[in-house]
Amino acid sequence: MIIEVFCDGASRGQGQKRIGEAACATTIYRNRKKIAQFARGLGPRSNNEAEYEAVIAGLLICSMGDLLNPVIYTDSAVVANQINGKWKCRNDSLLPLLMTVEDIRDEFNFKVVQVERSFVWEPDALANEFLDTLEKRKTPKTKDDVV
């Protein structure tokens, strides 16, 4: 059985800190057939935090569904290289997320692969659609909507 988990995070942050409204999404395939998809808002987060949250969500779904030995695909070099032990994590906001992934790794095996952005198009679209929906809710439609 082949389990593939496609993950992506998105943040609408601007400026130097790049923290803004964020969302994560994941799609899961078993033997090339989609069996699950998930997206959720995260509040104010960086893009790297959102990318980690997408991986964690995918892993948790796999662990609950007995989907063993998944291959996790992410377009984030930071996330892939930190999880695979190639890069050290020096960011205080990412370290707890990396530790969560390591705790999950104690439960079952998985492989993390960095891919081109086009490879994770589906969760990318889900995460951005989620953020678009949030923005539409916050945008006043008439002058009476402005407080």
What is the predicted role of each segment?
Residues 136-147:
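Flexible, low-complexity interdomain linkers flanking nucleic-acid-processing modules
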Residues 1-49, 60-64:
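RNase H-like nuclease fold core
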